[in-house]
């Protein structure tokens, strides 16, 4: 082995979780449902292919359609930790990969000097020992089997996308002071985008692609009743059909599944049996986040 190289045989997430090795897409869909996540067949197939082919999965769709929740649910199905990297404008490699614990390094130098140690080269060498390394999400994902969620990658800049390309190409990184670190088992990697900007084709080419739509009325009813077992079928149906009508309006921010669940929970807490104008007025803040949108929806429900 080359000095400084830490490498293991790359296994897929399916192989790394032995008892799941024979799962097919339908069994994944059923397993997701058991966690409370109602997935479409195409999403379950995309997950199965991502694991089978050792490829990242790029999930795109409007905010609130369940992209992040799908990663969480899949981590539960695989019984693996979820490691999440939340992207934002200005994020760089040190915040995503690793950094050095500068305060502890300074303490080490002072302790060495107090102990009468004068070998400058040895002190400098010890400063970059692994114990002073702060593992950020991407490095942690190389160190243990996991589901890696790179959330809202569209918020990051072009330079960070280029950095991700290198990481996702072979699930390995080189730390100059330590050497190369490669994954024992490449993580099931899920990237999400809310389409606030176009993500470069080069990054998408590394991945399998899946677009998540707002759910159909039937699927939204199932989602609501799965997540809120105490709700009646009639109220769940009225919520789902009303939300579908609302999404057709010209809104600043159309409600996603997360918001429809919040609205359903709010109506349930209010003891609603149906959506009366009065209850709608009291509860629309759970569904919509802009006053102009609320005014439009109030007019719709009053008509």
Task: Please report, for each region that a protein language model flagged, where it lies by residue.
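C-terminal regulatory/interaction module of P-loop NTP-utilizing enzymes
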Residues: 9-303
């Amino acid at each position: 082995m080359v000095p400084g190289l830490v490498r293991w045989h790359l296994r897929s997430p399916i192989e790394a979780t032995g008892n799941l090795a024979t799962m097919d897409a339908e069994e994944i869909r059923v397993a997701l449902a058991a966690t409370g996540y109602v997935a479409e067949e195409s999403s379950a197939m995309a997950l199965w292919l991502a694991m089978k082919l050792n490829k990242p999965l790029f999930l795109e769709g409007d905010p609130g359609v369940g992209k992040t929740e799908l990663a969480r649910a899949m981590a539960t199905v695989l019984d693996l930790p979820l490691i999440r990297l939340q992207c934002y404008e200005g994020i760089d490699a040190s915040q995503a990969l690793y950094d050095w614990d500068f305060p502890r390094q300074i303490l080490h130098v002072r302790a060495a000097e107090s102990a009468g140690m004068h070998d400058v080269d040895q002190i400098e060498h010890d400063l970059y020992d692994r114990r002073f390394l702060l593992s950020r999400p991407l490095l942690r994902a190389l160190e243990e089997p996991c589901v890696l969620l790179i959330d809202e990658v569209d918020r990051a800049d072009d330079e960070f996308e280029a950095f991700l390309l290198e990481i996702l190409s072979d699930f390995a990184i080189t730390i100059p002071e330590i050497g190369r670190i490669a994954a024992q088992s490449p993580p099931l990697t899920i990237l999400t985008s809310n389409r606030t900007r176009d993500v470069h084709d080069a990054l998408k080419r590394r991945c399998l692609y899946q677009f998540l739509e707002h759910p159909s009325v039937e699927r939204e009813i199932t989602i609501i009743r799965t997540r809120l077992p105490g709700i009646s079928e009639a109220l769940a149906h009225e919520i789902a059909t009303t939300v579908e009508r609302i999404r057709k309006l010209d809104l600043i921010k159309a409600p996603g599944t997360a918001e429809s669940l919040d609205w359903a929970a709010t109506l349930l807490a209010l003891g609603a049996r149906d959506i009366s104008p009065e209850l709608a007025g009291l509860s629309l803040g759970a569904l919509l986040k802009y006053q102009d949108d609320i005014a439009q929806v109030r007019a719709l429900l009053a008509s």
